[in-house]
């Protein structure tokens, strides 16, 4: 697939997500969380292209959180943002030391790291008056999270494309919800984004997400529709076919 075709495909799916879930309103100030990885770079680049087109009237701002991880170097990232003329701020908060101190060796850091990062993001967005917080999760993240929740937490849940935070003060959006990771990888390579590796997560083996990712990949080899069917399932819930006592009073569920 050519460079333009990949970009066109991704923009199509981002616009579809924006429209399907009413993610961005006219005049919104959208804070895009830029981690330095392929997904967040792709999100920021595509939203910037859509903004420049002019059919969607909104402003974007790149928020970068330097968590003081070993080897962090944001000089190329700064250069890329300056070149694109995208306003940004890089905020330094040493969450790395906290995670290393609190989590035993060999255990996954993702949960605590995510909580600390989320608190900082929410606080910054509120202080600066941003109306939307955009995250770079894509289709594969959504379906992997669904299986992880089922297998390891006993819950049917995932990452919604649009979410009101628990404190009711923030709206999170995931414009890449329909985008496949393989297309994002191609796009990131073509754009030559100056990626910053996550040395905290990347050093850990056998993470649950990687195991689930392999499982979905194996199933897709037998039936290529498996990933798209899983995504469709997230918007095709049949509560009457489940076992949740909060949805149904089974004692009183009888013929009149």
UniProtKB/Swiss-Prot annotation:
PANTHER family given in the database record: AMINOTRAN_5 DOMAIN-CONTAINING PROTEIN (PTHR43686:SF1), SULFURTRANSFERASE-RELATED (PTHR43686)
SUPFAM superfamilies in the record: Adenine nucleotide alpha hydrolases-like
Hydrolase is among the record's keywords: no
Record's function text: Catalyzes the ATP-dependent 2-thiolation of cytidine in position 32 of tRNA, to form 2-thiocytidine (s(2)C32). The sulfur atoms are provided by the cysteine/cysteine desulfurase (IscS) system.
Name the UniProt record assigns to this protein: tRNA-cytidine(32) 2-sulfurtransferase
Molecular function in Gene Ontology: 4 iron, 4 sulfur cluster binding; ATP binding; magnesium ion binding; sulfurtransferase activity; tRNA binding
Compartment list: Cytoplasm
Cellular component GO terms held in the UniProt record: cytoplasm
Subunit structure: Homodimer.
Motif PP-loop motif mapped to chain: 35-40
Classification via InterPro entries: Rossmann-like_a/b/a_fold, TilS/TtcA_N, tRNA_Cyd_32_2_STrfase, tRNA_thiolation_TtcA_Ctu1
Enzyme class per UniProt: transferase
Gene3D superfamilies per UniProt: HUPs
């Amino acid at each position: 697939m050519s460079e333009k075709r990949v970009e066109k495909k991704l923009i199509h799916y981002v616009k579809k997500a924006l429209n399907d879930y009413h993610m961005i309103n006219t005049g919104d100030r959208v804070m895009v969380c830029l981690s330095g990885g392929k997904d967040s770079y792709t999100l920021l680049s595509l939203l910037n292209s859509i903004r420049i087109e002019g059919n969607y009237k909104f402003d974007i701002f790149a928020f970068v959180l330097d968590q003081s991880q070993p080897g962090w170097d944001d000089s190329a990232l700064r250069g890329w943002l300056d070149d694109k003329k995208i306003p940004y701020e890089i905020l330094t908060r040493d969450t790395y030391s906290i995670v290393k101190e609190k989590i035993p060796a060999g255990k996954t850091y993702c949960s605590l790291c995510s909580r600390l990062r989320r608190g900082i993001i929410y606080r910054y967005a509120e202080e600066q008056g941003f109306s939307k917080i955009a995250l770079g999760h894509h289709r594969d993240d959504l379906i992997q999270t669904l299986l992880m929740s089922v297998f390891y937490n006993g819950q049917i849940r995932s990452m919604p494309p649009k979410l009101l935070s628990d404190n009711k003060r923030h709206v999170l959006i995931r414009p890449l919800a329909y985008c496949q990771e393989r297309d994002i990888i191609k796009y990131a390579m073509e754009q030559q984004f100056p990626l910053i590796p996550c040395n905290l997560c990347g050093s850990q083996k056998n993470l649950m997400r990687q195991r689930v990712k392999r499982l979905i990949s194996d199933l897709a080899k037998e039936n290529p529709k498996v990933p798209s069917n899983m995504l469709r399932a997230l918007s095709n819930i049949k509560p009457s076919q489940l076992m949740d006592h909060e949805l149904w009073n089974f004692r009183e569920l009888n013929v009149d």
